[in-house]
């Protein structure tokens, strides 16, 4: 135990020291807050395995005549854009046009009414802003950025000549598929094979599903499109400039799909800020056989294996964040010798200060986990709701 004299001496020394330094106590270090950092998100792991499972189930198709793979792609594509807008809103990086549209959409379609099927819930949770851990939380947030001008000035241009556009849901393109599908099917005087031959896009569902859906197509009340439609604004790109009513019918299909899968939720379960999975880059490995130019939708010649490495500068990543990043692959770097998109995800240093942190850690290459996705989706499928 310290003596009374030593305690008194310590207090005296401290008081003397403070008296000498009193004029300098106002000099305090202020750590600058770095700007926000962004990445361009990818939807290439979305929906396909679910659609294959649903198309293979006779009971589901019979119970849900409004279902078609294109409708589910349309719904999930719209939600992908909306969730990215929510993340952008969290970091105050939306344009006035985007902000007004987001508020209008959520007024018409509250988060609790937007079903998210179980296999996709984790994917949508990764589309958020997140706070880096280092240094001292002074780095700005990391978030998925979408183009302020999502579409071209004319619909018949199909999409913007922008690399990022190829990895975002092409909602006008899905509408083109729907219109193309229904343009031939109502004409019962043609043989199914002849209709398929005249269609621009071979359909991966069976022909009976296409024909049954044609009878339900008018239920959706989709707006009439024109080649001259300007798709530069988000409301026009998502086909909601004049009315959002058609989306209610699409939501009904999504409700039926979500009810058929374990672990489903709503967009209200997907916070616009939270998971640090978006601080992990999924670097795709060069496949043994490079993809070829596709001639139609879902052309297998354009597909490739999804071997990958995980890379990040974060030192204390939760295991769940790494698993979610690998499963959802919403933030990717394409392998450099892809014949069309080899530079996607490679130029990150100009996307904000977070990407300049070093060193970068890496995982081992995983060449097999992606093969389990179809079985994971099938295991989550409960069958049509009764």
From Swiss-Prot:
Entry GO CC: cytosol
Recorded name of the encoding gene: ILR2
Keyword tags: Cytoplasm
Top-level taxon in the UniProt lineage: Eukaryota
Record's subcellular location: Cytoplasm
Coiled coil region boundaries: none
Protein name as catalogued: IAA-leucine resistant 2
Species assigned in the record: Arabidopsis thaliana (Mouse-ear cress)
Phenotypic consequence of residue 319 to L: In ilr2-1; resistance to the auxin conjugates indole-3-acetic acid-leucine (IAA-Leu) and increased resistance to cobalt
Lineage of origin: Eukaryota, Viridiplantae, Streptophyta, Embryophyta, Tracheophyta
Function: Regulates an ATP-dependent metal transporter (e.g. manganese transporter). Probably involved in the metabolism of auxin conjugates such as indole-3-acetic acid-leucine (IAA-Leu) and IAA-Phe. Required for root development.
GO process annotations (BP): auxin conjugate metabolic process; lateral root morphogenesis; response to metal ion; root development
Summary of the knockout phenotype: Recessive resistance to auxin conjugates indole-3-acetic acid-leucine (IAA-Leu) and IAA-Phe, but normal sensitivity to free IAA. Defective in lateral root formation and primary root elongation. Resistant to manganese- and cobalt-mediated inhibition of root elongation probably due to an enhanced ATP-dependent manganese transport.
